[in-house]
Amino acid sequence: MCDGDCRPLGFLLGLPFAFLSLLLSIIGVIIWIVGLLLSCICPCCLCVTVLVEIAIGLIKAPIHVMEWFMSKIPC
């Protein structure tokens, strides 16, 4: 059916969701910076490591949302 991964309609429809994900990733960056500072102060806290991992997931959210949304749109 489709010979390529070019789905401009899916890209355009996914832009509002990507914008919301971008806001989440900005929050993730803030959490990541705070988590890194806390882990430098007290490296024995395991919960800070989990917090940093969640923040990294939030930072990658816009890319995952756009890929997911574009994969749902047929050619």
UniProtKB/Swiss-Prot annotation:
Tissues where this protein is expressed: Expressed in shoot apical meristems (SAM); mostly specific to the L1 layer in the center of the meristem but also detected in the L2 layer in organ primordia. Also observed in the vasculature of seedling roots.
Organism: Arabidopsis thaliana
Activity regulation, short description: Counteracted by the antibiotic cefotaxime during responses to light stress.
Disulfide cysteine pairs (residue numbers): none
A GO CC term attached to the entry: extracellular space
Reported phenotype of the disruption mutant: No visible phenotype.
Protein name according to UniProt: Signaling peptide TAXIMIN 1
The UniProt record lists the keyword Nucleotidyltransferase: no
Keyword annotations of the record: Developmental protein, Secreted, Signal, Stress response
Compartments it resides in: Secreted
Segment forming the signal sequence: 1-29
GO biological process: fruit morphogenesis; organ boundary specification between lateral organs and the meristem; response to light stimulus
Domain of life: Eukaryota
Described purpose of this protein according to its UniProt entry: Signaling peptide involved in the regulation of lateral organs separation, including fruits and leaves. Involved in the perception of and response to light stress via the control of sinapoyl-malate accumulation, a UV-B protecting compound.
